[in-house]
Every structure is written in structure tokens, then in C-alpha cells.
Amino acid sequence: MQDDNRFLKINFEEPKNSLNQNTMDAVHVLFYSEKNVLLSQGFQEDKILSSFLKNNIIINSSNYVIVRSETGTFLLVRRKLQKDVGFTSNYLEELGGNIYNSLKSIGHSIVKIYEEEAEINLRIALGILLGSYNFSNYKKNKSKEKNTLNNVIFL
């Protein structure tokens, strides 16, 4: 008998006009550029949330920032622009793996990634899948780390 929770489900959905925060168990992944400009679209209507996220981008200098607020949990990810040197498929796959590693043990089961470009979504999804693979079948001492992440949605 197979355990369905060991598989990571990846869905691609149509982007909505506003950020849907009805899912309390979801982490919203938003991208911003190296010049601290928010790249993810679809939530500018909420001015308070938009300014809150922009302030967190400016304050934190790291590439991955987890922000919790009353409107939800957000992972702010710094990434290169398509025209930048080093923006390759390998870069996006590593970015996806780093996103997975940042979120795998924080207790949320759903991740919503806000990126409109299909090719970028494809490479990030591959990176998430590669990052989610564990070698537990080949280890003598199995890890006790609990992974709760089981659903990734690209919007």
C-alpha cells in the first residue's frame, strides 16, 4: 500500500486578479528583483499588504525572507530578471530547490507561487521536484524530519 502523502502535487492555475488568502495553510511565494522591485503580480489592489511587503523587502537583505502577517504567510524570494546575466534554466531549478528547502518544515501543506511566465514556472517546478527527493530508501539511519509540504500551485 502506497502512502499518497509522499508525493508532491504540482498544479498550474489561471492567475486571479487578487491574492486569494482564504487558504490558511498556504504559503504565498512572491518574487522581487535584485533592485528590490516586486515582480509578482496580482495583489497590488491591497495597498496595505503591498506596502508591508515592500518594506520587508527593503529591510531584509537576504535572498529568502519568510514574512508572517494577519493576511497570511509569505516567502519573498529575490531572483534575477530574464535579461540579467546568469538567468539560466539551471539557475531557476536551483531557485526551485531552495524554495522547497525553505518551506518544507515550516508546517504548511500548500504553496502558491505567483509567477506569470510559463517557462520560469516549468523550471522552478522541476527544481522543487528535484529538491523534494529524499534518499531515505538508501540510508541506513532514516531521517526523522517531518515534511508537511505536499501541494504546490503556480498562479
Predicted regions and their residues:
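Short amphipathic alpha-helical segment within the helicase RecA-like ATPase core
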Residues: 1-155
